[in-house]
Amino acid sequence: MIKFEAGKYDVIVVGAGHAGCEAALATARMGYKTLIITMSLDSIALMPCNPSIGGTGKGQLVKEIDALGGQMGLNIDKTYIQSRMLNTAKGPAVHSLRAQADKFKYHEEMKKTLEDEPNLDIAMDEVVEILHEGNVVIGVGTKLGCSFKSKAVILATGVYLNSKIYMGEVAFYEGPNALGYAKYLTDSLVELGLRMRRFKTGTPARVHRDSIDFSVMSLQEGDEKVTPFSFMNENIEKKQEPCYLTRTTEETQKVILDNLKRSAMYSGVIESTGPRYCPSIEDKVVRFSDKTSHQLFIEPEGLNTKEMYIQGISTSLPFEVQLDMYKTIKGLENCKIMRPAYAIEYDCVDPTQLKISLEIKGVENLFSAGQFNGTSGYEEAAAQGLMAGINAVRKIEGKEPFVLDRSEAYIGVLLDDLVTKGTNEPYRMMTSRAEYRLYLRQDNADMRLTQKGYDIGLVKKDRYERFLNKKAAVEKEFERLKNERVTPKEVNSLLEEKGATPIKVGISLYEFLKRPEVTYELLEELGKGAGDDVSREVKEQCVIITKYEGYIEKQLKQIDQFKKLENKKLDEKINYSSIEGLRLEARQKLDDIKPISIGQASRISGVSPADISVLLIYLEQIRRTRGGKGE
């Protein structure tokens, strides 16, 4: 094909899903001329599966994206139709925000955000090859014959590389929602030396709202007080749409088991790996055979559509079996399927080929993010896109990568898990993956990360000033709580009325608030609150810091120990095969992963404590030969 020079950019982003949008906005907002290429303008920030943002572990990622200056939190705050804080019966370490989105408005808002960004161009085309000179990437070539040159390329291809749809015996190459698929790019990546693999995911059917009997389902309403995803917002309350809960039946199970061999998953047609924590209904029935019923959530896809998403019943069964199966579910007996369920298989990369900066090892200036890296979920994708965008800019500027470690952010946990351990299935973030989750709460993401975002040039002045004001307000209120006191006379009658233990002597509000039964609302009832001048989120911060102070201090000490190993840096040019004392497996793994620190090396499967001791001795020898300077 004849190529023509179509333009020069600092950064080119391939794909405009959740990863691509964050990557392109980050590079453009940091002052670099950016091009984002998508196969369809109608698929920008598409939600091809669940129409929601957030959830357990995922809400934390969105809050962190926002704290660093990303877009996802702002976008969902504009377009949510129901919001719920999950895990409120547990401690704040696992509180996770989740919002149902109007998926069509979400797409429109993100598309408009891209269009309004001065340093960002949008092109509808298909990237078919990565242009390179040796191992240095210099741009991309497209299906329309365009040659775009750039200083960095970010791959955010989602599930579109050689994507194949499965519904029972029916299979065809296509992207989600009847969109096209990328047929040629994988070959170009293999030519560059990338190790590719096949993963699978799936989605349930969408059914017509008017064909559902909601009267036999349980109503699931949103929170009365809505917590925004973005730290730039305070009050975003509006009329919310209800969701509904129903369950499968024994008849559902019978339909599935009778047709199990017709499922693409169980007929042997699909051999790729699917997401463990989002199993198909076939997997649920087989793996949890003792259960005769599984819960399903009925969720609206938007305000101006009658499509309803049936969460919890993704499948690759044939369409006619789907029709029989859905009609065995309480409330769906007469349902009309508008879009059938399907499984989708796609190419992705082995993420152990990535540096922690998300640059491909051995290929200069090529970065990647999102499902291409083996993850699942919009939030995981967006987080990677943001970090890939930041680090593409820093590579252009000749600066060290921007790295968040496991003690600083869920984003740090995500990236460290991917590049250090790899993944054999689509990776999903969960609170249990974060060792320091009491410190890495969603409520303090701005306190942890906004200064960092400002220092690298992504957080703008208005957000930074808001952060400084909140920080000062928290410190001021915390000081007031420590200095202001309550007496038995002031509080005991109310405490006894509420069945709580009276106090014997006067104590500070800080000590009073430490008591399990004392809430900030109780302080306000006693006339001891800060009043309306102090925001709800500032009060929440003070309560959490006060009640969990001992636990947080203990975790901070653990983080200090963790940092000692993280701060012992390893040069990526080290030849591990030349270090005596390392076991053969450790040498191979270390040469492959190329960890940036002793801490990261210690988390590599196959590297033992004895191997770490050898590395520490090696670093000490290097330090001595350099006259005690550095590691």
From Swiss-Prot:
Gene3D superfamilies, per database record: FAD/NAD(P)-binding domain (3.50.50.60), GidA associated domain, C-terminal subdomain (1.10.150.570), tRNA uridine 5-carboxymethylaminomethyl modification enzyme MnmG/GidA (1.10.10.1800)
Q: One GO molecular function term?
A: flavin adenine dinucleotide binding
Q: Which superkingdom is the protein from?
A: Bacteria
Any single GO CC term annotated in Swiss-Prot or TrEMBL for this entry? cytosol
Q: Which residue ranges run through the membrane?
A: none
Tell where it localizes: Cytoplasm
What do we know about how this protein assembles, alone or with others?
A: Homodimer. Heterotetramer of two MnmE and two MnmG subunits.
Q: What is this protein called?
A: tRNA uridine 5-carboxymethylaminomethyl modification enzyme MnmG
Q: Which organism is it from?
A: Clostridioides difficile (strain 630)
Its taxonomic placement starts with: Bacteria, Bacillati, Bacillota, Clostridia, Peptostreptococcales
